[in-house]
Amino acid sequence: MPPSRRQQVWERANGCCEYCQLPQDHDPRPFHLDHIRPQKHDGPTVLENLAFCCAACSLFKGPNPAGFDPETDVLHPLFNPRTQRWSDHFEWNEGTLEGLTAVGRTTISVLRINDPLRIQHRLLLIELGVFPPELPPCSGE
C-alpha cells in the first residue's frame, strides 16, 4: 500500500482510532489500516474501505465483519466508520464506551473496547486531559 494512502486515512481520522477514538500519539503500538469489509470477504483496498485503527481494535476485529449483540444474542454488523456516525452508536461514560445501538454494543464486544486494561489506559488519559478527543476530529463526523 502506498504511504500516501496511509497518510490520507490518517488525516481523515485525525490520527485517532476510528472505533475506540484512542489518539495514535497515546499508544506505543503502531496503528493499522483496517479493511472495514475484510479482505477475507473480498473487501477492496480502497479509501472507502479503510479505517485508521489502533492495534488492539484491529487485532480483536480480525476478519470479522459482524458479531453478536451481547444484550440480545442477535447477529449484527460491526460499526462502519465510512457509512455510520460514531455518535449515533457510542458515547463515553468516563473511561467506558457505551453502546447506544445493537451495532455499537456488538462492536464494543467484538473489539473488546471495554477490557479492563483498555479502560485503565483511557482513565489515565482522561486524568491527563487528553481523552476523549473532541468530537468531531476523531469521529469522522
Regions from the PLM with identified roles:
Residues P30-P38, F52-C54:
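Histidine-centered catalytic micro-motifs used for acid/base chemistry in nuclease
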